[in-house]
Amino acid sequence: MQVSEMKYGERAIQEGQLITFPNPRPGRQYTIEITLPEFTCKCPFSGYPDFATLYVSYIPHEKVVELKAIKLYINSYRDRYISHEEAVNQVLDDLVAACDPLYMKIKGDFAPRGNVHTVITVEHHRQTESLC
């Protein structure tokens, strides 16, 4: 069996990080909506692939997540054994850690498997400092 070198796309996914840039309109609340139709991971019980469309909606604070970085980050799930619930929650945790948004919602709409259709929705609301 021939051992092949890592392909450039695999290397980009492995080295990818969630990159942010300054919000160009920090004084205005606006919503960024991103659709990621090719999310894949593996079932931690069977090893079968799971497919989903992820919908990300957020109101940025001081930082915005760069789109190519999100794509590479999402592609890193392809070979991970992770449940639907944990996958969507982990994506939320990682994106919130990267950009600290005012608000973020992620919906994972997983393709039916075994006659079961799963949709997982998670939200984050930025904590504001108490006035007291």
Curated annotation (Swiss-Prot):
Pathway entry: tRNA modification; tRNA-queuosine biosynthesis
SUPFAM superfamilies: Tetrahydrobiopterin biosynthesis enzymes-like
Leading EC class: oxidoreductase
Disulfide bonds: none
Catalytic activity: 7-aminomethyl-7-carbaguanine + 2 NADP(+) = 7-cyano-7-deazaguanine + 2 NADPH + 3 H(+)
Chain sites annotated for binding substrate: V65, E66, L67, H84, E85
Key words of the record: Cytoplasm, NADP, Oxidoreductase, Queuosine biosynthesis
Residues forming coiled coils: none
Cell compartment(s), UniProt: Cytoplasm
Family annotation (InterPro entries): GTP-CH-I_C/QueF, NADPH_dep_7-cyano-7-deazaG_red, QueF, QueF_type1
Active site positions, chain numbering: C43, D50
UniProt main location, coarse: cytoplasm
Matching Pfam families: QueF
HAMAP family, A to Z: QueF_type1 (MF_00818)
Record's function text: Catalyzes the NADPH-dependent reduction of 7-cyano-7-deazaguanine (preQ0) to 7-aminomethyl-7-deazaguanine (preQ1).
Homology family: Belongs to the GTP cyclohydrolase I family. QueF type 1 subfamily.
Name used for this protein in its record: NADPH-dependent 7-cyano-7-deazaguanine reductase
Species: Thermosynechococcus vestitus (strain NIES-2133 / IAM M-273 / BP-1)
